């Protein structure tokens, strides 16, 4: 009992410090702003022909993106998806042969960096990747093919406020991890397995709105503090902060219906990386990751993660990439990280052109928008764009596509996926008024509840639908048990990554 009381005291104290983060951020930001002009490691010369291997603060990042946009107007577009707590833009740069206009039949992917402000390697790698793509478009056949057939959206910093108070050389700890209100943005999304009561934060809300507007097919979130590619689910039906502590040495996987695809995507990144596939263990308390990949919940479960949200609510396959054992390594090590990750990033992005893609049209050849689709026996769905387009990453094999839309007869189509290129599949739906007409077949699949494109996993379906039925806003965290829970979550995050 004495040990338990001591542990609770430590956790409550830790949570008090966490809740005070916003005040420390404000003071730190003023100090850093005063020193930034004299800081040699935060430098960007917009007249330079290439990006230096240094860390770039918000102002320098903004200048860099604007400069690249002006230099390469035919390959880049710059937009903001919203603002941080302290008013910084969440900049996104599109790199594509068609940066301003949608390319019919061409998929959108996104790469997000710096969701934790003190995990900074990914932020800088994305700036270098932007430069690499635009500078090699004319000379590199692979790069040209990728940009001609894909629209790539880069969000270098999802947590610019947190970055401004982080310190170079701090390999562990939480300073700068959270946003300016002291919230972990990777715990701030809707969760499939558990009601998430965290107060909504503007950075996470901006990403949710972004995902709702663009049908992303593939995504990665870049982190630091470990060296591993992690894939959904991040949470489990029985997840708890206590379980996270005890499962960190090798917990129970929480697998998606697309587990084969997620493992493939993760291993594609790992095997093309300089070191990741060796299963490097960064800290004494962390696992050895076989082949450099792990199921998120098997590592440690968390509630409100971004990759699970993308998969369940966005129909987008996202993995989490932990790129460095040190969260904020010295800038002198950035060239090494770039060499280790460049090919992995390129290979990963090209995986969007695997599986099946096509159009859903009606009998008059008009696109069917927001038709709900799923691969039979894989009960997490996706939907068509306003142009009737769809994409799904799949490994070679034979599959059946189930298609549903309001006012149309449901349809089931069998197809085959091969290794070399995506399968092109066009589906025609017939109006339900033609039911019973000769030559128009029906399937036994019926839409039941208006959310048929949502996932249905037997082990968690009841709890999920209970969550969906709630109509009242989620209350903010409060009370001693919430404090204990938050304390455990933050303790686990800072220890394990």
What are these model-derived regions, one by one?
Residues 245, 329, 334-355, 426-429, ...:
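Beta-strand-rich domain onsets/edges
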Residues 1-20:
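Cleavable N-terminal signal peptides of Sec/SRP-targeted secreted and luminal proteins
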Residues 375-396, 415:
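Short, acidic Ser/Thr/Gly-rich low-complexity loop/linker segments typical of extracellular
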Residues 356, 362-379, 442-464:
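Short, ordered, surface-exposed loop/turn motifs in non-cytosolic proteins
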């Amino acid at each position: 009992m004495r040990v338990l009381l001591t542990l609770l005291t430590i956790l409550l104290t830790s949570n008090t410090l966490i809740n005070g983060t916003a005040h420390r951020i404000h003071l730190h930001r003023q100090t850093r702003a005063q020193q930034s002009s004299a800081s040699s490691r935060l430098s960007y010369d917009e007249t330079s022909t290439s990006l230096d291997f240094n860390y770039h603060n918000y102002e320098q990042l903004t200048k860099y993106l604007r400069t690249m946009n002006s230099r390469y107007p035919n390959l880049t577009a710059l937009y903001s998806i919203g603002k941080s707590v302290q008013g910084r833009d969440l900049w996104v740069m599109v790199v594509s042969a068609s940066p301003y206009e949608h390319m019919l039949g061409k998929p959108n992917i996104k790469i997000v960096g710096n969701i934790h402000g003190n995990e900074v390697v990914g932020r800088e790698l994305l700036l270098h990747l932007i430069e690499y793509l635009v500078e090699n478009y004319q000379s590199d056949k692979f790069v040209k093919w990728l940009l001609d057939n894909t629209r790539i959206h880069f969000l270098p910093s999802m947590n610019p406020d947190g970055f401004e108070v982080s310190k170079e050389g701090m390999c562990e700890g939480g300073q700068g991890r959270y946003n300016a209100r002291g919230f972990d943005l990777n715990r701030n999304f809707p969760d499939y397995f558990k009601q998430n009561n965290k107060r909504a934060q503007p950075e996470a809300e901006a990403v949710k709105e972004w995902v709702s507007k663009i049908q992303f097919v593939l995504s990665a979130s870049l982190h630091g503090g470990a060296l591993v590619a992690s894939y959904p689910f991040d949470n489990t039906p029985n997840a708890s902060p206590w379980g996270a502590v005890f499962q960190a040495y090798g917990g129970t996987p929480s697998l998606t219906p697309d587990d084969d695809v997620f493992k493939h995507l993760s291993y594609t990144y790992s095997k093309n990386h300089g070191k990741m596939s060796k299963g490097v263990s960064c800290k004494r308390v962390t696992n050895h990751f076989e082949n450099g990949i792990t199921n998120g919940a098997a590592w440690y479960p968390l509630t409100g993660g971004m990759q699970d949200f993308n998969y369940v609510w966005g129909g987008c396959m996202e993995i989490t990439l932990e790129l460095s054992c040190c969260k904020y390594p010295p800038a002198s090590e950035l060239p090494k990280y770039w060499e280790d990750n460049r090919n992995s990033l390129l290979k990963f992005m090209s995986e969007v052109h695997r599986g099946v893609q096509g159009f859903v049209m009606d009998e008059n050849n008009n696109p069917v928008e927001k038709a709900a689709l799923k691969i039979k026996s894989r009960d997490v769905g996706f939907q068509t764009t306003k142009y009737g387009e769809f994409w799904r990453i799949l490994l070679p094999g034979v599959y059946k596509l189930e298609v549903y839309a309001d006012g149309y007869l449901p349809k089931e189509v069998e197809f085959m996926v091969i290794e070399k290129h995506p399968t092109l599949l066009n589906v025609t739906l017939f109006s339900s008024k033609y039911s019973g007409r000769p030559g128009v077949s029906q399937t036994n699949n019926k839409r039941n509840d208006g959310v048929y494109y949502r996932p249905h996993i037997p082990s968690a379906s009841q709890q999920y639908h209970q969550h969906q039925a709630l109509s009242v806003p989620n209350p903010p965290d409060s009370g001693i048990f919430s404090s204990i829970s938050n304390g455990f979550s933050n303790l686990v995050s800072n220890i394990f990554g």
